[in-house]
């Protein structure tokens, strides 16, 4: 309300008071009415906060940055931090004289995310494996069991070509954005044969001659 100067008489109306686009002579009742009107004054929060920027899995606890969040206007609750890649839900509740644009002070839910980290390369066989009559498995470059699970044919005995598969775990994705299994070929080479000859293992037969 606005109080304006009036006449010099101390016994009459000394000021005018206006509120809610109305104007009347000052009185105790009007002052109280103005105070009551101000007591129910509300301030509107124009937008519910939203996640600003992106988060990527690091293995550590992270919290999002919020666009439109002011702790003097609202409280934050729900899930406000996380470790694993995925979607979480925070809540925002107006405090004091603040309300949402719908006039309520009810908590509003807002989703936020932590994205999967990237696995840049599909594992590949490193080194060679040669047939030895026993089951063998290859060594893999770029393979980390915390990032990828291995499947398909992981070991074999005979010489030949085989196919293993690699699938990102829940916090990882391939560089193309996919999370499905990718195949990787690996081989067991043929062993090199050898023949050992000794004098005791040989016998020679000569044809009989007449004469």
Regions from the PLM with identified roles:
Residues 41-211:
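Solvent-exposed beta-strand/loop surfaces, strongest in extracytoplasmic domains of secreted
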Residues 1-42:
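A signal for long, low-complexity, Ser/Thr/Asn-enriched, surface-exposed stalk/shaft
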